[in-house]
Amino acid sequence: MNEKTDIFSYKSTFDPRLNINLIFKENPNYNNMRDIFDVYGYGFVAPEFKSIFIDGEIFLGEDGFTLDDLKFIEAHEISHILLGHNGPRSEKDELEADLGAYILLKKYNISTERLEDEFEYRHGVPFSEELLTMVEDKM
């Protein structure tokens, strides 16, 4: 990727109607977006633009996130849409979005390792496929 790139966009793997946009610090809107990332995490959905915005800076450097991490973030954000989450951020919605992401990642044969490794830290309970019953009928 060219160092001067300020945004990298592609169609979602999970829903090609949505654009995935990785925003980098060279983008003139990055500082404003950074404030949103600080509130919502690595990414957020902008349904009015049919887009998901992800902080591209987390993928740079030796300790940067991987392609599997990117797909986890993408699947998580798309799960918010599929699950009808549209209110203020809640722990329940975040838990459900991670479970939805697990279902999507498995469906597309993409690693769920990061999701499973981080699940207890993120939600206070260990990951179990039994939890999927919370969202299976909505996905």
Q: Where are the predicted features?
A:
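A metal-dependent hydrolase signature that marks the N-terminal structural subdomain at the beginning
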Residues: 1-34
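Active-site His/Glu-centered metal-binding helix of metallohydrolases
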Residues: 74-83, 96, 100
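An active-site-proximal "capping" alpha-helix that borders the catalytic cofactor pocket
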Residues: 90-107
